[in-house]
From Swiss-Prot:
Keywords (A to Z) from UniProt: Acetylation, Electron transport, Membrane, Mitochondrion, Mitochondrion inner membrane, Primary mitochondrial disease, Respiratory chain, Transmembrane, Transmembrane helix, Transport
Noted disease: Mitochondrial complex I deficiency, nuclear type 14: A form of mitochondrial complex I deficiency, the most common biochemical signature of mitochondrial disorders, a group of highly heterogeneous conditions characterized by defective oxidative phosphorylation, which collectively affects 1 in 5-10000 live births. Clinical disorders have variable severity, ranging from lethal neonatal disease to adult-onset neurodegenerative disorders.
Native source organism of the sequence: Homo sapiens
PTM-bearing positions, type N-acetylalanine: A2
Protein name from the UniProt record: NADH dehydrogenase [ubiquinone] 1 alpha subcomplex subunit 11
Amino acid sequence: MAPKVFRQYWDIPDGTDCHRKAYSTTSIASVAGLTAAAYRVTLNPPGTFLEGVAKVGQYTFTAAAVGAVFGLTTCISAHVREKPDDPLNYFLGGCAGGLTLGARTHNYGIGAAACVYFGIAASLVKMGRLEGWEVFAKPKV
């Protein structure tokens, strides 16, 4: 399932169909947030059922918001700048997602650090896609 969702994102050219790109990044981030929430609730059990539901929602919706902001920012910056395959678009998207995380946590330090780290990570992923880097090589049979 994961390769299908990632393929859905990468098959859309940058700077086009921003709503579909935002949907893809939101769904990917939501699954990541739900996974983090499952670990959080399992390893640090809440006092009541409602506290657990609140924590799961908090993690999931925060991740979904970060994913949506990332997808929209990368697509809109590619469209506005008219440079669809530029890693700077992904840096801007990662930075915007990091700032969203900082706003959610009400912490400037987290927002600034997440802006830099998410931006660098996203631009490295884009550079890797453009240059054909293989992180996990396919086995040669």
